[in-house]
């Protein structure tokens, strides 16, 4: 019986000891919080906010340790940055496929390529929307001290909100251009032998058909100019 009591007290003592250790560790971590917060704020102010780049750097092991729990807050920015880079790369690939479409005849003969590229862009947009929803949810649940929140909010606007707006615009314009190219290809195909192809141009015998073709082509070129303007903005942030 004494042996059982001894074992019981040992278990109780061990439990109390471990509980005390946990509280000590928690207290120690809490004592580091001001220092960790200060380090994180300084990092955001010196490495993120002044940078012209859209992407954000990956934290080193030392930085993660110095930021403590705030390394998880930074993950919101870095996770989105990683997804954004992948999305832009995917959109560029879709547009590269379109570079093989260099003539009116190509828009007829390569409609499958155009349609495939458009579906890829649609998939990228769907993933972008899901990613942004997840990021916004994580961001809304943050509980940060006021001094950190003021700086982090600026970093969030710069590295998430603004890039997301540019990516959304890029994908929408790309989809519109691909849709217009597909529409032109279908239109030319519907005319059959009423249209002749000479080099990169299409020749019509009916003025109304030519006018409609030019109208469609002009609308597509306007969208291409809009996409080029967005691309220039992005080029300055690479």
Language model segments and positions:
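Sec-dependent bacterial lipoprotein signal peptides
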Residues: 1-26
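A cross-kingdom marker for long, charged
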Residues: 194-238
């Amino acid at each position: 019986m004494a042996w059982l009591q001894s074992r019981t007290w040992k278990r109780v003592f061990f439990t109390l000891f471990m509980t005390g250790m946990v509280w000590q560790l928690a207290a120690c971590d809490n004592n580091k919080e001001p220092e960790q917060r200060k380090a994180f704020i300084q990092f955001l102010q010196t490495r993120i906010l002044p940078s012209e780049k859209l992407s954000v750097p990956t934290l080193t092991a030392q930085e993660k340790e110095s930021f403590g729990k705030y390394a998880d807050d930074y993950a919101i920015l870095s996770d989105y940055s990683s997804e954004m880079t992948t999305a832009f790369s995917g959109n560029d690939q879709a547009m590269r496929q379109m570079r093989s479409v260099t003539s009116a005849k190509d828009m007829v003969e390569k409609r499958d390529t155009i349609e495939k590229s458009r579906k890829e862009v649609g998939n990228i947009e769907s993933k972008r929307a899901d990613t942004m929803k997840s990021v916004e949810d994580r961001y809304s649940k943050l509980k940060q001290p006021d001094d950190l929140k003021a700086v982090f909010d600026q970093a969030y606007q710069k590295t998430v909100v603004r890039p997301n707006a540019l990516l959304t615009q890029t994908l929408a314009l790309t989809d519109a251009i691909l849709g217009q190219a597909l529409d032109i290809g279908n239109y030319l195909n519907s005319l059959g032998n009423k249209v002749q192809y000479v080099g990169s141009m299409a020749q019509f015998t009916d003025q109304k058909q030519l006018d409609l073709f030019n109208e469609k082509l002009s609308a597509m070129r306007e969208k291409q100019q809009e996409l080029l303007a967005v691309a220039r903005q992005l080029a300055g942030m690479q």
